[in-house]
Amino acid sequence: MLMTTNEPVNAGDLAAREAAALYRLMTWLSPAFPVGGFSYSSGIEWAVEAGDITDTATLADWLDTMLGDGSGFCDATFLVQAYRATEAGEETSLRDIAELASAFVPSRERQLETTSQGRAFIDIARAAWDAEGLDAMVAACRTPLVYPVAVGVVAAMHGVPLAPTLHAFLHAVVSNWISAASRLIPLGQTDSQRVLVRLEAAVAATATRALSATLDDLGSATFRADLASLRHETQYTRLFRS
């Protein structure tokens, strides 16, 4: 039953909650948060060597496709579903989401990438940003949490709103992709920012789709990117772990 109240919302309390949520998101999804994202390229390293990515235009096109038709949308959807299951206290649903998210990863190195970051995110959250009930929700999953599921669980346990959490997560993922590419192509700082600007609409569109998606909407059509993550495993000279 929906409960309503005529009591006014205290603007000061609302501003404080919004500031606290923003502070947490900026901390958790900052490059300084030690989840090790800098050591992974999500297959971009192989794509650069193969000549698929050579400049800002080809990088922006590659990442736009990854966002809308590949791991970007899938990870965003898993984050949303994990957040909602955690918020509702649905441990069985969360376990199913965590297992499916892990199974959806297309290669061994991408599995290493997302599970190691997820584990680090949860470990640091427990140590420095703990929340009542977090341990129980993580334990209920009975499987290592991939990165987007870990972010969704922690954000929900802290009461950080879903929409900004999702946008911040996608921004962080895209920024890490661009950072990896900037070292490989290479790109200057200004060109890297130009790519980020070009992807602003794609990030927003991916987040909007994920917020209304269900697990039945999951799917990927980024065959070249998936192949890149597989071939990176045997790439002779590598800077990154994926």
Swiss-Prot record:
Subunit structure: UreD, UreF and UreG form a complex that acts as a GTP-hydrolysis-dependent molecular chaperone, activating the urease apoprotein by helping to assemble the nickel containing metallocenter of UreC. The UreE protein probably delivers the nickel.
Subcellular location as annotated: Cytoplasm
Main location: cytoplasm
Family to which this protein belongs: Belongs to the UreF family.
A cellular component annotation (GO) from this entry: cytoplasm
Protein name: Urease accessory protein UreF
This protein's UniProt keywords: Chaperone, Cytoplasm, Nickel insertion
Pfam families: UreF
HAMAP family: UreF
A single GO molecular function term of this UniProt record: nickel cation binding
InterPro entries with a match to the protein in the record: UreF, UreF_sf
Domain of life per record: Bacteria
Function: Required for maturation of urease via the functional incorporation of the urease nickel metallocenter.
Gene: ureF
